Amino acid sequence: MSRPAQLDRRGFLALAPALGAAGLLAACSRTQVGTGTPKEDVGLLAKLREQGFVKVGFAGEAPYGFQDGGELSGEAPTLHRAIFKALGVPELRPALTDFGSLIPGLLAGRFDVVSAGMSITPERCGKVIFSQPEFVSPTALMVRQGNPKRLSDFASCAREGATVGVLTAAVEASYAKAAGVPDDAVKSLAKQQDGLDALLAGRIDAFALTGISLRWLARTNQGAAVEVGSPFVPEVGGVRQWSAGGAVFRPGARDLRDAFDRELAKITGDAGRYVGLVGRFGFTAKEAPPRSLRTADLCAGKGPA
């Protein structure tokens, strides 16, 4: 999981607090009278079908949404391509954007969907609307090959007296401590590669991060004598710590979002199809969101029932 202050996929950048008078007038001119809905969002799906493409914003963050040899790739674009094709929109046209500019760019109409694996948070739900979850990001442990201490979760780390590496200021430190790992056995590291290097050097016994990120780290360090364990969902105070991401739409594009959700459910509800689409990016059936995990609950700051 990423550091709270970092502007990456899971960070949050608030929009500018106020608009000038000219901006307000421009915004009014773009809305449907009596609804507050941007004009271009009325019948948006029909428009996309007619033009044959949808503009998507992405931030160039692997494995969620990035360019590979000039082609748009990653978890989100792959899912979204399949969904929009089913909706009669055969092409995704990418717009590479700084992560912090994705929501402002969406609201300004520079693209119609954010395809970046953006986490669903209450703060963002106050600005935009999300699809149902596309994935969850359970935690995992990277250990030395063979897993000599048989570590599987934070409780096993506490039991075995293991030293756990985490990213500086990341939430995994609090998860480990909540499971009983002593403060002096939790070691902070500046970046992901530092975690793998510390593990290989024997300075830590496990490196804790999301399973998705750890599998990608292992993939980009092929030949390293490490392995990534099965993902698990930590608990703090009896509350399971989920992190879920989805597609992002303007508030007026509910019809498009709802159509998107109907196709998304066909994929996330079929583990074989889900892994067949996004498995090459490090996603497994355990990253498929449970049926009980709903965007409305995540927007309210709650987990699944």
Protein language model features and the residues they cover:
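Short helices/loops that flank or line small-molecule/ion binding pockets
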Residues: 85-86, 93-96, 100-114, 127-129, ...
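A ligand-binding cleft/hinge motif common to bilobed small-molecule-binding domains
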Residues: 117-126, 175-178, 205-241
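Flexible hinge/capping segments at coil-to-helix
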Residues: 132, 145-163
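Periplasmic-binding protein-like
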Residues: 136-142, 222-261, 285-304
